[in-house]
Amino acid sequence: MTRSTRQDTGQEQFLTVLSRDEALARFEAALFPRTIPTEELTLADALGLALADDVMAPIDVPPFDRSNVDGFAVRAADMATASEALPARLLLNHETIACGVAPQIPVLAGTATSISTGGPVPRGADAIVMVEHTQPTEGDAIEVRRGASPGQFISNAGSDIARGEVLLRAGTVIGSREIGMLAACGIALVTVARKLRVAVLSTGDELVQPGDVLRPAGIYDANGAIVSAAITENGGEASFLGAYPDDEAKLEAAMREALAAHEVLILSGGTSKGAGDVSHRIVNRLGAPGIVAHGVALKPGKPLCLAVCDGKPVVVLPGFPTSAMFTLHDMIVPLLRRMAGLPPRTEAKVTAKVPLRIPSELGRTEFVMVSLVEGDEGLVAYPTGKGSGAITSFAQADGFISIEALADNMPAGSEASVTLFTPHVRVPDLVVIGSNCTGLDLVVGILFRAGLTVRSIAVGSLGGLAAAKRSECDIAPIHLFDAKTQSYNAPFLSDGLELVEGWRRMQGIVYRPSDIRFQGADADEAVRAALADPNCMMVNRNQGSGTRILIDQLLGPARPDGYWNQPRSHNAVAAAVAQNRADWGVTIAPVAQSAGLGFIALKEEHYDFALVSARNERPAVQAFLTALTSPEFNEGIERMGFTRPG
């Protein structure tokens, strides 16, 4: 196939897909060594930046011998025999030494001077006695009833910081503690590595900025805000320059202008080889050496493009949010920190068991975002799923695990090393794994306002039951209909689990109101009409969900067109029908109403909870059960269109 033909089909192929390490090595070789720009700033303005040079202490701290307590400056030799039975009597000098007051009268043998905490120790004194160990007596004197040793309650000059010692070393990130040390030495200005000026652009005809009206087939631009925030979090000065359509001439002009005014250019989108992806073609025209890596054997993140243009790094991140954020944090942020003179981030790792088999693609190192929960035998890592286009998979994950390029899966039960996104594992108060529902969000909101943290992982009813049996959660939301007993949920429980009633929600067939095939029909008639029309396409639900079980019972052996389209949520089903990508599906009444769809009632299902009996007495579980019976919950659940049993 010729180059022009490949371009016409809109599917060019990556010329060379590199390993992560090889791509980084090429990028670093083109970037470094380089001089780090510096500037002199006040302490307040230097907060969060890295020192460019070692800072030497210009003075001793403290700059004089000072008292650590309120009391009296004395000579220790006068206290040699002092005791309760035989107190030492000392005449008081006629001065009181407060903070900031230079002493005028020396302490001679047999005398003492009143001194406050922080006051400079007078000449002749070599110890401080606490005021509570003394007693005033006649003749303007005190009695001391406890002995003292030389140096007692005195901080000598330079005991904290000595003049000429290295106070802070180059590369130290300036925080509140460092500012305190610098200020204590009288230092007002420091030389720091200047913040990197980073230009951020988003690309794509489909992008709409947050706050604007979402047009058909448009999506809101999340990458611009996310990338800019990540740059700021890591010591950069991000300038978001907006989103640009896939117009090669306009985009090139914007990229050249951005690169001229900034030290780094980061784009998202337009780096794949599909139709409309033009960013990578422009990059090679911006300066030498140009692209050093385009295509990295990572999942997510394969389309990553790395370039250096006349000494300035240019990065084109994948357009999908999870791909963009992972490659940014894993590969780009460490280099930006190095360019800004900042130390590497500290990576924390924990070991966790993987409860489910995770398939992987041979030939690419795959990074899987996971949420951590506490099981009976330690931490358990649940994949967040949702794909590289999902916003929440990165935001809600605790960390990630890696599957090597030579493996096609990670078996269930494997022990995996989890690289954490934060220094510590955030163990939630309550773990809920199973089916999702907007009603569940209401309960979680009540618990959140009560100060409890809840980890909710949507894996479907059967997945939730399996997690509950393995004691990997406290509660599993389920809605499973048993055709044999004609009842919900209870027949599916095993030993160690108990049923907690939740609420009722009406499941039904959804269709576009204009579709005459379903108008006025009941559920049986609607299904017969759909199965009789080969052009009538359905949208199913994912394996393991309660809705999928209901659909399979409804269809029997039939597998109509669209059966293998299996989204994981009610909202996805409604969207498919509303957008004419399917003609019918099964979802709950509130979702159908929100989407403006026709609705044929099918069955009132029971959305209940399988509770792990051994965890019943946990405070968070009790709080959950209390929330289920609260007036706030009952009123909210009715507003959502659900009903409570009884």
Q: Locations of the language-model features?
A:
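N-terminal segment of the mature folded domain
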Residues: 448-525
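Short loop->beta-strand "edge-of-pocket" segments that line small-molecule binding or catalytic clefts
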Residues: 427-436, 524-548
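Periplasmic-binding protein-like
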Residues: 497-508, 597-626
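Short beta-strand-to-loop elements that line the ligand-binding cleft
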Residues: 243, 453-460, 558-572
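Short, glycine/charged-enriched hinge/interface segments at domain edges or termini
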Residues: 2-18, 54, 73-245, 375-386, ...
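Flexible glycine/proline-rich
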Residues: 21-24, 39-45, 52-53, 66, ...
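A ligand-binding cleft/hinge motif common to bilobed small-molecule-binding domains
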Residues: 477-493, 574-603
